[in-house]
Amino acid sequence: AIFATDDFEICTRLVQGEYYKYQNMFKELPLHTVISRKELLDAMVRAKMCTAEKCPVKFEIAGSQLGLSIKDQTTDYHETVDLQENISEELTIGFDARLVIETLKAFDCDNEGISLQSPKMPMIIEAEDSDFKTIVLPVAIK
């Protein structure tokens, strides 16, 4: 199929076969909380500014707080963000800080739901007031 306007032309083709069942990635996870998008985004930006290296951010989630930290040879940054709902289990998980920041910027809401399962499983972030949701894959932390 060809889609054309005065400014551009897009050519596409139908891919044969079954499309990946991405809905299975968004299953309900056992650990869920709600957090202020602005507070988490601001904390992530401050943490990322402290290091020039590509370092993972470590989330330490317990009770009603999310501790985030970035550590490299010259930086040891820690900050705590309050959760709006207690989380039932403690969890430590790492993420690419840049990806978390870009993901949070894509949302247009005040609060986000965060769902987790384990340090090796993705985090699901969903808008509190819409159906928009995304997955952020974890990275290994030391």
How would you label these PLM feature ranges?
Residues 1-15, 28-142:
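DNA polymerase processivity clamps
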Residues 21-22:
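Specificity-determining recognition surfaces
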